[in-house]
């Protein structure tokens, strides 16, 4: 039996309109049990200032970003289900959903799926890795009832 443990931290000045803890739990449960039976993840919802500071400190990028993934790596002799932390910036997610003409809840789900795959070791540095990761993301999003996250909902193609 699989188990996903969520530690949800809301560090946004305004928590109105955020997805529910149940939403985040459902999104994690659509991803993590596919790869390991027991997982623990912290999701921290932040405002742009905190996202910007973390992105600058850990990635050298002087801007806020949608999601940051911080995988936890225990020493090899210690087995823990802790995968790591996802830091998701509310304002960036909301802005991107508008710009990309996507349903807001679907974009939140995509950020959780995308970030979770990073915690599991997936990346998109080169084209082959990106293609594999996007395929997995799209399958998971479809399983959740959402459209392909890489196609705008208003895209005529």
UniProtKB/Swiss-Prot annotation:
Q: What domain of life?
A: Bacteria
**Molecular function in Gene Ontology:** metalloendopeptidase activity; RNA endonuclease activity; zinc ion binding
The UniProt entry's GO CC annotations, sorted and at most eight, read: cytoplasm
Q: How is the cofactor bound?
A: Binds 1 zinc ion.
**Where can this protein be found?**
Cytoplasm
Any single GO BP term: rRNA processing
EC main class here is hydrolase
Q: Which residues bind Zn(2+)?
A: 114, 118, 124
User: Which controlled-vocabulary keywords does the entry list?
Assistant: Cytoplasm, Endonuclease, Hydrolase, Metal-binding, Nuclease, Ribosome biogenesis, rRNA processing, Zinc
- Tell me which cofactor or cofactors this protein depends on: Zn(2+)
Q: Which Pfam families match?
A: YbeY
Which family is annotated?
Belongs to the endoribonuclease YbeY family.
Instruction: State the protein's purpose.
Output: Single strand-specific metallo-endoribonuclease involved in late-stage 70S ribosome quality control and in maturation of the 3' terminus of the 16S rRNA.
- NCBIfam families in alphabetical order: rRNA maturation RNase YbeY
This protein is called Endoribonuclease YbeY
Q: Which organism is it from?
A: Yersinia pestis
The record lists the lineage as:
Bacteria, Pseudomonadati, Pseudomonadota, Gammaproteobacteria, Enterobacterales
């Amino acid at each position: 039996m699989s188990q996903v443990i969520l530690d949800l931290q809301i560090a946004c000045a305004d928590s109105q309109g955020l997805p529910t803890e149940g939403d985040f739990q459902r999104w994690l449960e659509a991803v993590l049990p596919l790869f390991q039976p027991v997982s623990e993840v912290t999701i921290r919802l932040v405002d742009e200032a905190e996202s910007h500071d973390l992105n600058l400190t850990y990635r050298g990028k002087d801007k806020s970003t949608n999601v940051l993934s911080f995988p936890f790596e225990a020493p090899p002799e210690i087995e823990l289900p802790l995968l790591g932390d996802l830091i998701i910036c509310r304002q960036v997610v909301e802005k991107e959903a508008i710009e990309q003409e996507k349903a807001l809840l679907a974009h939140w789900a995509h950020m959780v799926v995308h970030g979770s795959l990073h915690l599991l070791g997936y990346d998109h540095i080169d084209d082959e890795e990106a293609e594999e990761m996007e395929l997995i993301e799209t399958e998971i999003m479809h399983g959740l009832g959402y459209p392909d996250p890489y196609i705008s909902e208003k895209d005529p193609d």
